[in-house]
């Protein structure tokens, strides 16, 4: 489990490649953009900018600190919502995280600029942004590793090595510091135990995790996040779970599909296709080899097929919570000159917006007691694709207010809901994803079960569990 968690405070060189592979092509930046966004914001400047945005848009933003770095720098989140600080049932929560590796700060700057764009759009009554903010709660953590960033920023570019500032100040790679839930998932598969989600309760080790990991881990567990993205550098590709190889030798690379492989591929492809270059054959592979020519495979990759990572954040999200997270590699070059940042914004702006909109795909709804109308928390929601005979081996659970969310591509599905003390309920639906600001709403009112389940009900439950267990 995540040890010593504190409560969330809510209130080196690469092979030569063509320049456009990591610099971007955009030519629409203005002199004002270059002055404002053509440099990296240090910690003090970042905090000041977030404060400025909050003051400019107080009705739709709130600032909160989820913890501190080893050296005491605050991990500050800015939330955008029509009800900042309050979760509204069936309104999806999205989080975006930058600068997990201190020497990979493009995401830090993109997220800071995304925050300002949301604020300015709301002020100017931009139709798309107003629609997005009316329907979505967006949490932005520009920097998860401010200590590493300050180290990298304070090192002369000529002296900066490939790993300078990557880890936190204790020398720990934060993307290897989360509980390794993949190993638990693979072991449960091997022995045939039908447990596929929320695996943190089964995890135990004696590792003293880093304060940045603890803060983000606790934050991830504190809200019903639906969708998440983690911004990195070192290549140009959208990476999706699983990150840890299913092979017993965790160092071996092998395609390791999650139960939601199709959905994750769809999410990653959405980002890559909306990016100026990620999915296009207009740039050389970052490492100069055909093996990692990601553009030829649509600008996406399964994490473990690329290289195996145990203790990564995106798999933690998937196996500990209801959230789906992908990792976005934005540049071959790490920490490029600040003057190039406006071009990166041009390359990624559409992708970021379209990715957040994906939180409104699939289905969502409420699960309540049919007799009292009271919400049922921790109800288990299974999804069966219409082309499959058994459910996806990864259910989601309802939040404390009875709401659930399931990101899905268009298709026909059966939704099966089970809760202790209630009869199982199921509905068949067609997901079209044609409504931009809302997933398909599918509500359930569960009837209380008899004191002793009938033989038929027991058989139904046993059959459902056995079918899921057999799908290995």
From Swiss-Prot:
Its cofactor is Zn(2+). One of its GO terms (cellular component) is cytoplasmic vesicle. It is an enzyme of class 3 (hydrolase). Binds 1 zinc ion per subunit. One of its GO terms (molecular function) is metallocarboxypeptidase activity. Keywords: Carboxypeptidase, Cell projection, Cytoplasmic vesicle, Glycoprotein, Hydrolase, Metal-binding, Metalloprotease, Protease, Signal, Zinc. Transmembrane segments: none annotated. CDD domains: M14_CP_N-E_like (cd03858), Peptidase_M14NE-CP-C_like (cd11308). Zn(2+) binds at residues 101, 104, 232. Glycans are attached at residues 134, 385, 428. It holds the Pfam family CarboxypepD_reg. It is found in: Cell projection, Axon; Perikaryon; Cytoplasmic vesicle, Secretory vesicle lumen. It comes from the Eukaryota. Its EC number is 3.4.17.10. Residues 39-359 form the Peptidase M14 domain. During FMRFamide-like peptide (FaRPs or FLP) and neuropeptide-like protein (NLP) precursor processing, catalyzes the removal of Arg or Lys residues from the C-terminus following the initial endoprotease cleavage. By processing neuropeptides, modulates basal acetylcholine release at the ventral cord neuromuscular junctions. Involved in egg-laying, defecation and locomotion. By processing FLP neuropeptides, regulates the turning step of male mating behavior. Involved in reducing pharyngeal pumping in response to high CO(2) levels. Belongs to the peptidase M14 family. This is Carboxypeptidase E. The lineage of its organism: Eukaryota, Metazoa, Ecdysozoa, Nematoda, Chromadorea.
